């Protein structure tokens, strides 16, 4: 959004773009750019310069120079008016806000340090104005930050954080208020002393790392900084005035050029249109490509969606005949095999174990009345909602009993899920968190489930994509589940076996 799709910084890494890179291209890149006249050797420590130069000549002396290639990317087109860009994340209970735009700030610009002080005061540390407003004063978020980055081609300003759905619009309003304050008011004496002292302290602590010292030397060489730039850093920092900070705010805080990017539940999108210059919400997919949201009106009610699903997986008689199910699945995580076993039995009995290379990571069990959970052998506290969820999981087809258990059901609309149109069904239980299921319009099968995992600052949205339905004793069962949102990368779980109506002794569900 900030740089545009034609600028290298605006490129998004996808499976397709990665596949476009061949081994020959990597070899050519290495040949073109890994040359001594395009390299720096930096040594930090208690060393003898003469000895280290001799050692460098010994090991790198035969390295042949090459033609140093230079590329200048196209200029970034500054957004001329504020726009509201929205990326739908189904089922999300929080919105991620990023107010962002490119800035012309080079590493060797004379006002770089002044600009950094301004940004730190605005949103660069815990006691910043932005955090004080949205976290401390209003309680909208657990933390909000801003950053102002320099770059030899084009820098970037960004401000935002995660906020509750219902205060997304209010959070954006408060962000604009704080920007206006920075541009129209001198900071207070207390703020002035605090921000400079914090930055001076951070700088001093950073010198404890040899990597930081090496990076300072590299910056001086690469960006033609004064040789005493870092020696005089604290002195120059303390010389930044209140007026300097006000001037920098007016130079670099440009909300009129901003993309307000919001990732969250589309149910809140219409409330945000007022922030866009054209009073429209511009929708994008996760790769930053413009899309049109589906506006079709659902033709089925919630009960009809579930009836169609039950019929699709085998019919109500087949579904009700199920008394037990045992499923074994496997997934791979960084070359290690994760085994997942799930057993269900009528009477609210449920067992799930997750093992990594033979060692049990997690175990959940419900005997129909009581329930327990452990992670790596350590007992976990279960809420009433957790226990009820485990009981619900014991059903082969829990959808059949949603209404009888008092769940509130609502078809919210039609979504495009991985190229398929699907009904969005929101389920609100009597106890616990709401979740969402997506049913393929064509087949009637569930193709996605979205649930909220965790609480407070640790809350995350877990998405499970279901596919590869196969028949087992006359019933369709998904044999592939891709789980995303609760870990750095998606986890693909494949069903290895499904046993329906085979004896599972009650002792399997015994709670220790």
Features from the language model and the residues they span:
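Buried hydrophobic packing residues in well-ordered domains
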Residues: 26-29, 41-43, 56, 99, ...
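An aromatic/glycine/proline-enriched structural segment found at the starts
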Residues: 40-105, 264, 273-294
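Flexible, processing/modification-adjacent segments and terminal tails
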Residues: 297-311, 365-433, 441-443, 452-461, ...
